[in-house]
Swiss-Prot record:
InterPro entries: dsDNA_mimic_put, Put_dsDNA_mimic_sf. Disulfide bonds: none annotated. May act as a double-stranded DNA (dsDNA) mimic. Probably regulates the activity of a dsDNA-binding protein. It comes from Salmonella typhimurium (strain LT2 / SGSC1412 / ATCC 700720). It holds the Pfam family DUF440. This is Putative double-stranded DNA mimic protein YciU. It comes from the Bacteria. Belongs to the putative dsDNA mimic protein family. Signal peptide: none annotated.
Amino acid sequence: MEMDLNNRLTEDETLEQAYDIFLELAADNLDPADIILFNLQFEERGGAELFDPAEDWQEHIDFDLNPDFFAEVVIGLADTEDGEINDIFARVLLCREKDHKLCHILWRE
């Protein structure tokens, strides 16, 4: 898979794309109670944070996760407005190279 460093989503574009995918698929993958909780609390405590892919993704996929091209976006709620997300609703793995659309999601169980 040939990828171009100059053809990547920015960090903001990556966060936005992951959040859009989350919103589109949440109803099919989360409990209704979780969706209500997320929607009620997101304004005050919700967020999406960008990370290099965690090592445990290798249990779910079978290719190299070069952090130059792949990012993990954690979507959920924090205890405080500026706190770290500790109530995770989804972990979204995205390829940031614009010509390689790839997305995997680990949903809250």
